[in-house]
């Protein structure tokens, strides 16, 4: 029987998605606050750098694992300020997280040109060659079958389309690595317990980060999905990395 990891636990592969859904449903209303607290606000700078990888906002963009909509709404605001003709589709398998994204888009008056689709990254309900950009931020490590999700990304992108992924990665510098590991395993779950009442969700978070492939290992996975011109850029000493590639 196929098995996979849910954090450090071994589970049946077909159980992972429902467990991940449960994690995010339980913390959805405190998700943005926890991101600020856990990263000391750094996630906002990482995401700003991420959206700079999209120079042409007159584009059809698919944001997968949209969560509460941070990336898509940053893009929508930037496009609105520039007067760009952007088309944005926010996709997430978790309906509660998408509900948070919809609410934020209305509150910020950024709901124009946005579409919301409940879907799995492994089985996207879009035709081949549909999008100019595929973005995914802090989401791909939660997908049960990452290779399948990468192949779906390749399928739905147009020729010359760009794949861009922001994800936690491997810290190279030993002192930072030691501090980061201590903070991740000893502090983040406690913050999660205080703010959300759900320590287990943040145990899963830090365990999933620890298990995610290194920058170079993930680069190989992207290549095996068919992409070319693959690059990554480390941020904050490799705590996170921006991966990019093209469908040529």
From Swiss-Prot:
Supply the name of the protein. Answer: Ubiquinone/menaquinone biosynthesis C-methyltransferase UbiE
Q: What class of enzyme is it?
A: transferase
Q: Name one Pfam family in it.
A: Ubie_methyltran
Q: Which HAMAP family match?
A: MenG_UbiE_methyltr
What reactions does this protein catalyze?
A: a 2-demethylmenaquinol + S-adenosyl-L-methionine = a menaquinol + S-adenosyl-L-homocysteine + H(+); a 2-methoxy-6-(all-trans-polyprenyl)benzene-1,4-diol + S-adenosyl-L-methionine = a 5-methoxy-2-methyl-3-(all-trans-polyprenyl)benzene-1,4-diol + S-adenosyl-L-homocysteine + H(+)
Q: Which SUPFAM superfamilies match?
A: S-adenosyl-L-methionine-dependent methyltransferases
Please give the PANTHER family that the UniProt record associates with this protein: 2-METHOXY-6-POLYPRENYL-1,4-BENZOQUINOL METHYLASE, MITOCHONDRIAL (PTHR43591:SF24), METHYLTRANSFERASE (PTHR43591)
Gene that codes for this? Answer: ubiE
Native organism: Rickettsia bellii (strain RML369-C)
Q: Which GO terms describe its molecular function?
A: 2-methoxy-6-polyprenyl-1,4-benzoquinol methyltransferase activity; demethylmenaquinone methyltransferase activity
Cited InterPro entries: SAM-dependent_MTases_sf (IPR029063), UbiE/COQ5_MeTrFase (IPR004033), UbiE/COQ5_MeTrFase_CS (IPR023576)
Known EC number(s)? 2.1.1.163, 2.1.1.201
Query: What PROSITE patterns does this protein's entry cite?
Result: SAM_MT_UBIE, UBIE_1, UBIE_2
């Amino acid at each position: 029987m196929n098995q996979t990891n849910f954090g450090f636990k071994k589970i049946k592969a077909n159980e992972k998605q429902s467990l991940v859904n449960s994690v995010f449903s339980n913390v959805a209303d405190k998700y943005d606050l926890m991101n600020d607290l856990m990263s000391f606000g750094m996630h906002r700078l990482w995401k700003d750098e991420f959206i700079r990888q999209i120079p042409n906002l007159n584009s059809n963009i698919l944001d997968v694992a949209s969560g509460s909509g941070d990336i898509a709404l940053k893009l929508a605001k930037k496009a609105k300020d520039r007067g760009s003709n952007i088309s944005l589709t926010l996709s997430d398998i978790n309906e509660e997280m998408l509900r948070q994204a919809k609410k934020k888009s209305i509150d910020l008056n950024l709901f124009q040109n946005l579409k919301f689709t409940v879907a799995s990254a492994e089985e996207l309900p879009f035709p081949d060659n549909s999008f100019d950009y595929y973005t995914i931020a802090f989401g791909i490590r939660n997908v049960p079958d990452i290779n399948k999700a990468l192949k779906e990304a390749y399928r739905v992108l147009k020729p010359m389309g760009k794949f861009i992924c922001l994800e936690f990665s491997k810290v190279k510098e030993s002192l930072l690595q030691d501090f980061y590991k201590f903070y991740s395993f000893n502090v983040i779950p406690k913050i999660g317990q205080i703010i959300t009442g759900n320590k287990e969700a943040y145990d899963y978070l830090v365990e999933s980060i620890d298990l995610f492939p290194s920058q170079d290992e993930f680069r190989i996975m992207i290549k095996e999905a068919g992409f070319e011109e693959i690059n990554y850029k480390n941020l904050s000493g490799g705590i996170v990395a921006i991966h990019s590639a093209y469908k040529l």
